[in-house]
Amino acid sequence: MTYQYNIATSKKDSRSNVCLLVCHALTDIITLFLSTFLIAHIYSVTQGVSNYIFNVGVYETSMYVAVAVAYFIMSPIVQKTNRIWIYRLALALRAILVIFVVFFGENLADMIVFAGALNGISYGCYLASYNVIRQEMVSRNSMNSFLAFSSIVSKTLSIVAPIVIGSLIDISTFSQVAIYVAVICIIQIIVSFGISSKRPENSTYNLKQYLNKLKTNPAKNKIKHVYLTYIAYGTTTIVGTLLTVCVMMEFGSNFSLGAITSIISAVSVVVLILFSKFTKPGKRAWLFIVLAILPLSSLLVVFLPSTYAVVIYQVCMGIAMIILNPTLATYRNGNLKEAGLYDCIDEHQSVVELIMAVCRIVGFVLLMLIGASGNLVLFKVLLGLSSLSYSAVLISLLIYEKKYLANNKTV
């Protein structure tokens, strides 16, 4: 697709940027509640560890199936309509889910598929619209500042929000906290009306045409390498869920979950600052080698399970994630500019999302089957293998930097 529409005035541009930034920050809080803490809540409404693992697997599987379906239905529609309404639809659906939790939170185990599917549809619509809106609303001159400020806000929330939400749930109830989150959802929808957008002229979406262009493009090997890396990365998605499950099985407390998450976020932010300040693309081989070793900490949980093992594993994986995620995100779209395919960015995003969707669904189906089997040894095996996927991604990035970036600053 081609972005034909530009904001006419700096005042309008500024208003849309601020509203989009606020909405995205509020999304971080809502997502934390509907992922980490909703998964923790399933623990409190489920009898038995095996049933808990099964229900989490069902929730995540239904969610990511719905994400894939909604994303691929909405991606072409986004190009044919005013995409801000798809964005607001995503926010409204998520608000409905939170309100659903307010009234039916204690019976969540009986309606787990509905909750997962509704969350997935909302997230799929959000993915299909947010990236397009951001690219359209934020001018090229403002993009770096927008991303930098957005990152600062997100990292700050990742430190403060978990321990606040966890504490509130423990001193009140999950449904009570859901009311507060519902208010945040309503505020988010109101703020979204400050974002101005319209359907660009001559905007198209043709996935088949993009794949045909890619076959003959000189940069195809670099782009395909990124796609292969995302196969391994897609399998790592399950790790965040498994970390939450481990903490709840070990501590059984939302406050503990929030405190551990906040501490890890704080440590991760410091590591990310050092990473950004002292490393450069093409000269990070040593760092990727060190980071590839960290997921081996999962072996402590597998063979020497204890409170300390869980905490060490959480810290190691937090450090690995905070370096891996932004690095891979940089390489995700950077090659398109070099290849002259940036007008096909939505089609490219669809390929990446399809790869990750398949890997995520496979991972959570395995988790569901493990829960049904009642064999916790298999849970530990899945924990170890999915954690080692981070090592595979880091090794792939190491090869990428050695092969393509050693003497070249472009990504």
Name what the model sees in each region.
Residues 287-325:
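C-terminal transmembrane helical hairpin of 12-TM major facilitator-type secondary transporters
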Residues 36-46, 74-76, 159-178, 249, ...:
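Transmembrane alpha-helix termini and helix-breaking/packing motifs in multi-pass membrane transporters
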Residues 21-31, 35, 60-71, 93, ...:
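Substrate-agnostic recognition of the 12-TM MFS/MFS-like secondary transporter fold
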